[in-house]
Amino acid sequence: MSRIGKKPVQVPAGVTANVDGQKVTAKGPKGELFFVANDEVSVKLENNTVVVQPLNESKDARAKWGMSRTMIENILKGVKDGYERKLEINGVGYRASMQGKNLQLALGFSHDVVYQTPEGITIAVPKPTEIVVSGINKQQVGQVAAEIREYRGPEPYKGKGVKYAEERIVRKEGKKK
């Protein structure tokens, strides 16, 4: 069993954290985020460190203990540095471009796919085959990157499609004659 919850979360320099009951609020140079911890854990702010403790020893409480600690760490890092996810596009004629705030993708369909950028997320296209999704909320950045990838995920024969920059596609061999 993971014991990640035992480690206290250090509040980084330049970030102010506030604990009000179960609600943890973090304010930093990139913005402000909050997280409401589950009722099965207690959250305390002690000398610039956030400490999370389970209220009982049930398996459910211990699981929520580790999850709450990780979520608090994510919001503290998000308001200080932010998160970003890079996507790469492979394939002949596959490309991306920005149309105002919307992302326009040419992915081999009969029409271009237009993805509307959600609030709190920034999408940049440094090259026509590269997309950078950034924001302060780790979950939202990952969700937007997954939604863009879902339009045309990488296929195993030629590797065409949208993939994460760090993702490795396991290639298959084609049919033999």
UniProtKB/Swiss-Prot annotation:
Any single GO BP term: cytoplasmic translation
Keywords: Ribonucleoprotein, Ribosomal protein, RNA-binding, rRNA-binding
Organism superkingdom: Bacteria
SUPFAM superfamilies: Ribosomal protein L6 (SSF56053)
Record-linked Pfam families: Ribosomal_L6
Any one Gene Ontology cellular component term annotated for this protein: cytosolic large ribosomal subunit
GO molecular function: rRNA binding; structural constituent of ribosome
Similarity section: Belongs to the universal ribosomal protein uL6 family.
Subunit structure comment from the entry: Part of the 50S ribosomal subunit.
Function as written in the Swiss-Prot or TrEMBL entry: This protein binds to the 23S rRNA, and is important in its secondary structure. It is located near the subunit interface in the base of the L7/L12 stalk, and near the tRNA binding site of the peptidyltransferase center.
Name this protein carries in UniProt: Large ribosomal subunit protein uL6
Organism per entry: Rhizobium meliloti (strain 1021)
Gene that encodes the chain: rplF
